[in-house]
Curated annotation (Swiss-Prot):
Species: Bos taurus
Vesicular-side positions: 117-118
MF GO annotations: SNAP receptor activity; syntaxin binding
Gene Ontology, cellular component aspect: neuron projection; plasma membrane; SNARE complex; synaptic vesicle membrane
Sites of Phosphoserine modification: S63
GO biological process, one term: vesicle fusion
Descriptive protein name: Vesicle-associated membrane protein 1
Compositional bias per record (Low complexity), positions renumbered to this chain: 1-15
TM region(s), chain numbering: 97-116
Keyword Transmembrane: yes
Domain of life where this protein originates: Eukaryota
InterPro entries: Synaptobrevin-like, Synaptobrevin/VAMP, V_SNARE_CC
Cytoplasmic side: 1-96
Gene that specifies this protein: VAMP1
């Protein structure tokens, strides 16, 4: 049988196995990954802050729009009631005018009948 395989020995600390150029020490790699992760977290936090600001701004605009819609609804209701009152007023004026016109026509007919048949 052959001799058991031994793991390659590293010449210097942080040297790559197989005799290649030495890689960064494991502590540096984890620091770099930690920094990248922190940068990503900061980026996400910034994006979330912007999103929260936009949501608050949108909420304020919606609140203002709701207030304006309520005011418009109140104005429309007031307009509707005043228009109904005005319509009724002019309907009665029109009725009075028709009654007066009918009375004048009746008087003219009576005068003509009396004039010709008397």
């Amino acid at each position: 049988m052959s001799a058991p395989a031994q793991p390659p020995t590293e010449g210097a600390e942080g040297a790559a196995p197989g005799g290649g150029p030495p890689g960064p020490p494991p502590n540096m790699t984890s620091n770099r990954r930690l920094q990248q992760t922190q940068a990503q977290v900061e980026e996400v936090v910034d994006i979330m802050r912007v999103n929260v600001d936009k949501v608050l701004e949108r909420d304020q605009k919606l609140s203002e729009l709701d207030d304006r819609a309520d005011a418009l609804q109140a104005g429309a209701s007031q307009f509707e009631s005043s228009a109904a009152k005005l319509k009724r007023k002019y309907w009665w004026k029109n009725c009075k005018m028709m009654i007066m016109l009918g009375a004048i026509c009746a008087i003219i007919v009576v005068v003509i009948v009396i004039y010709f048949f008397a």
